[in-house]
Every structure is written in structure tokens, then in C-alpha cells.
């Protein structure tokens, strides 16, 4: 099954965040592509942010490397060093164990989408 049909993977906007933090990600929809396709060592999430949507609360990872690949639209990467606009084809990488709190925010007037990929280390802490 090399080619993945995204429409065959359940899309959700569920969150584990309690209020008031959950409302920040209410305009986020995502598909857990890695889990749905049987990847055991890589996590992959396809995410769509509606205008005003956040990808998550700002966070960083112990034991997990992460890469974000912008697919469509425009999002603002918010991190410790400031803010950077990401457009289709742009990449952002986050090395494990570097305390750089980050997330994406859609400040544009249309949806944007990206893929986030990380290594699945069972000892990791987010």
C-alpha cells in the first residue's frame, strides 16, 4: 500500500487539551496517517488549519525529532526565535531535546495544510 488515499483515513478535530486551551485548536482537523498505515517507527499527521486555527499549544519534544512540511496555503510558525511565514514546499525542523516551544497558526483568510513527521520513541516526552 505505498500510495495513501487520505480520504480513507478518519479526519478528526479531537483534542486532549482542557478548556480554555481546547478552543485554540478548534479550527484544526487532522488525520493520523502513520498509525492508519501501520508505521511503527514514524508518526505522520496530515493537518488542515482553518483561518484562525492553531496546530497545537506551543510545545517541544524530549526524545523526538520532528519535521513539518507545508503543503498548501500559508501558516505562521511561532517559536522561541520569533515568527516565520511558511508556504508550500517550506520545511521546519525541530531537534529532539531542544526546548524550543513551537506551533503553527493560520493567520490567512483560507485553509492551509501541512504534514508533521516524527520518530516514535517510546521513551519520549512531549
Regions picked out by a protein language model, each given a short descriptive name:
Residues 50-54, 74, 83, 98-100, ...:
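Short, charged/polar surface micro-motifs in flexible loops or helix N-caps
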Residues 125-126:
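Conserved small/polar residues in nucleotide/adenosyl-binding loops
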Residues 80-97:
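Short acidic-glycine-tyrosine-enriched beta hairpin
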Residues 38, 96-122:
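Ligand-binding loop in jelly-roll beta-barrel domains
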Residues 46-50, 60-78, 117-119:
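Short, conserved beta-strand element in jelly-roll/cupin
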Residues 1-41, 51:
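A short, N-terminal "cap"/entry segment at the start of jelly-roll beta-barrel domains
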Residues 29-30, 45-61, 99:
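Conserved short histidine dyad/triad with adjacent acidic residue
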Amino acid at each position: 500500500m505505498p500510495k495513501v488515499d487520505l480520504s480513507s483515513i478518519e479526519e478528526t478535530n479531537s483534542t486532549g487539551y482542557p478548556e480554555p486551551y481546547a478552543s485554540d485548536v478548534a479550527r484544526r482537523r487532522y488525520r493520523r496517517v502513520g498509525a492508519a498505515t501501520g508505521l511503527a517507527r514514524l508518526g505522520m499527521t496530515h493537518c488542515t488549519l482553518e483561518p484562525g486555527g492553531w496546530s497545537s499549544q506551543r510545545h517541544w519534544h524530549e526524545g523526538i525529532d520532528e519535521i513539518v512540511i507545508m503543503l498548501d496555503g500559508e501558516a505562521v510558525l511561532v517559536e522561541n526565535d520569533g515568527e516565520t511565514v511558511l508556504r508550500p514546499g517550506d520545511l521546519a525542523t525541530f531537534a529532539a531535546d531542544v526546548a524550543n516551544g513551537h506551533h503553527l497558526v493560520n493567520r490567512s483568510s483560507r485553509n492551509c495544510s501541512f504534514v508533521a513527521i516524527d520518530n516514535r520513541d517510546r521513551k519520549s516526552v512531549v
